[in-house]
Amino acid sequence: MEMRAADRARCTHLADSHKTIGMPDDTFNFEEAWARNQLPATGRRAEAHRLAGAMRRVIDHLVQVAAPEESLRAAADALEKYAERLAQYPVSRSYEGFAETANAGDINAFFDHSPIIGLANPLAPPIRLAVVDDKVIGHANFGVAYEGPPGYVHGGFLAAAFDEVLGMAQSLTGSPGMTGTLSIRYRKPTPLLTELVFEARVTKVEGRKIFTHCTVSADGVVTAEAEGLFIAVGHERFQQMAEATLAGSKREI
């Protein structure tokens, strides 16, 4: 499906420094925020990235090496002590950014906390994203911890990856949204330990409905594709959700 001219005009082209992504209560310059995120991390943020990277390596080794009992015990003892040490610090859930690309008030916070692309989140592979013209391009290399069928990426992790990359693509319309439906076609197994390329774009916009499409390929061969429907939701609604969570309650969306 081709995007209509009116829909295309709503998308942000990062080569045009004058265009911004606007929130109902704010004007968010996506290009400037993205550029800031690409700068080398420093201070506390840099150390958080370093710690998460080390934790990813621990996870990767744990699921595939036959370490002796004493080595596993020593590692577990050390990690338990460190977990107790971290627990002494106050919990910070300021919601500087939401783990949905289009709704991140602070793009650095979003990138750091996302379970898919967060550099400070050890659960993330992570996927590296870039915006090229009206497309979002993602690069990822899934390790053994993400294995489903022997030697291949678990389909559930691919689904989460599609949701994240499509979420970035729909953010280019300037309307923050949440996933309505996500349909995936697995064409063939997607290999582990291989450079994967995601390519996503908006196909059309109908009112609050944002339609998107994404493929993932390995060595130039498409292994899966996804169609995502996102429903635009005002930034103030996400702020209400954050405030409700901080207050320890839930509000109906």
Question: What is each residue range found by the language model?
Answer:
Residues 1-3:
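Methionine residue identity
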Residues 19-99, 103, 190-192, 203-253:
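HotDog/MaoC-like acyl-thioester-processing domains
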Residues 27, 31-39, 165-197:
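Hydrophobic beta-strand-centered segment that forms part of the acyl-chain substrate-binding groove
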Residues 73-145:
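Long amphipathic N-terminal alpha/beta scaffold segment
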Residues 131-135, 153-176:
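Active-site helix/loop of acyl-thioester processing domains in fatty-acid/polyketide metabolism
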Residues 142-156:
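Short histidine-centered catalytic/ligand-binding loop motif
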